[in-house]
Design a protein with these regions (language model features):
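Conserved N-terminal glycine/acidic-rich loop preference
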Residues: 29, 74-81, 106, 115-119, ...
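A short acidic, glycine-rich active-site loop
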Residues: 61-79
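Small/aliphatic-rich secondary-structure junction motif
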Residues: 2-65, 113, 117, 158
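Short glycine/serine/threonine/alanine-rich loop segments
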Residues: 35-38, 95, 119, 148
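Short acidic active-site motifs
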Residues: 105-110, 138
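General small-molecule cofactor/ligand-binding pocket signal
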Residues: 40-42, 98-102, 151
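Glycine-rich, Arg-bearing micro-motifs that act as flexible, cationic patches
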Residues: 119-144, 155, 159
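A short helix-to-beta-strand connector/capping loop
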Residues: 90-98
Length: 159
């Protein structure tokens, strides 16, 4: 098996603050507690620089270097991550949750993290057809490319 050399007992879970990722996080925590496994919550984020402004017919020239995110932007993402964890776990979870904030596309970040895991858990928004093709599917990419088993969790339906 491709994942046999990975650290024993590591579960990676993708987190983005959505109800689906909250459900995945709770499921992964329960599974980690059952397996006595290490739980790594991964939040992938991308920096999108603001578009330079120019008058019609002019070439836009950025006023500053947008090659990376500022500390304030990173701090805002870290706060979103912590809020998502607090929302998923109103009380202390049964396992320690290692937090990992990684800059990059979620699908590829989770694929890379899967190389060091025995199990990856992701949420699914349930998109299919054209919506999935146009918007992409992180869960599908991870299922197709991870070298270890992947569990896809849907958020419970209200009602």
């Amino acid at each position: 098996m491709a994942y046999a050399g990975a650290m024993a007992g590591t579960i990676v879970v993708g987190v983005d603050g959505s109800p689906e990722s909250q459900a995945a996080l709770r499921w992964a925590a329960e599974e980690a507690a059952l397996r006595d496994a290490r739980l790594v919550a991964v939040w992938a984020w991308t920096f999108v620089p603001p578009a330079p402004i120019a008058e019609p017919g002019m070439i836009p020239v950025p006023a500053m270097d947008y090659s990376g995110a500022s500390e304030a932007e990173r701090a805002a993402v870290e706060e979103e991550f912590e809020t998502a964890l607090r929302t998923a776990f109103p009380t202390t979870p049964e396992v320690d949750v290692e937090r990992k904030l990684v800059q990059g596309d979620a699908a590829h970040v989770l694929e890379a993290e899967a190389r060091h895991a025995n199990l990856v858990v992701v949420g699914s928004r349930g998109r299919s057809g054209i919506a999935a093709a146009l918007l992409g599917s992180v869960s599908k990419h991870v299922v197709d490319h991870a070298p270890c088993p992947v569990v896809v969790v849907k958020a419970p339906r209200d009602g």
